Swiss-Prot record:
This is Transcriptional regulator MraZ. PROSITE patterns: SPOVT_ABRB. The gene is mraZ. GO terms for biological process: negative regulation of DNA-templated transcription initiation. Its main location: cytoplasm. GO terms for cellular component: cytoplasm; nucleoid. Belongs to the MraZ family. It comes from Acidovorax ebreus (strain TPSY).
């Protein structure tokens, strides 16, 4: 399970360094094999390959009415591999789609990660914190 937020910098070639605390798990779980794709909220999803395969199967089974979402998730998916130093190359197309330039945030979301442009994430998080909490949390004990 992946959790927590990490501030990252993409280098000039569009590579990010996976935080050390996640490298061993990604190597053990997926041999360093990852899949990146678009997320409807404007970030990228980063899956260990076995989790991606499960997600891909679920998406592929959706009805024809979801064809465009299949295209968005599957058609934009890029398989990548961590190099020996834990770096991952994010394609120019996916960097552009998520508005990634240099400063980024990697969020552990359980079985996958979200990769956000830092400024975009901070703005969306601030807006969410100012908005009313969703009903699903009304009876949740903190």
């Amino acid at each position: 399970m992946f959790q927590g937020a990490s501030s990252l910098s993409l280098d000039a070639k569009g590579r990010l360094s996976v935080p050390t605390r996640h490298r061993d798990a990604l190597t053990a779980q997926a041999g360093g094999q990852l899949t990146l794709t678009k997320h409807p909220d404007g970030c990228l999803m980063v899956f260990p390959r076995p989790e991606w395969e499960k997600f891909r199967e679920r998406i592929a089974q959706l009805p024809m009415s979801a064809q465009w979402w299949k295209r968005i998730f599957l058609g934009n998916a890029m398989d990548v591999e961590m190099d020996g130093t834990g770096r991952v190359l994010v394609s120019p197309e996916l960097r552009e789609a998520a508005g990634l330039s240099k400063d980024a945030i990697l969020l552990g979301m359980g079985n996958h990660f979200e990769l956000w442009d830092k400024a975009t994430y901070e703005a969306k998080e601030a807006a969410a914190m100012q908005a009313e909490m969703p009903d699903v949390f009304k009876d949740f004990s903190f």
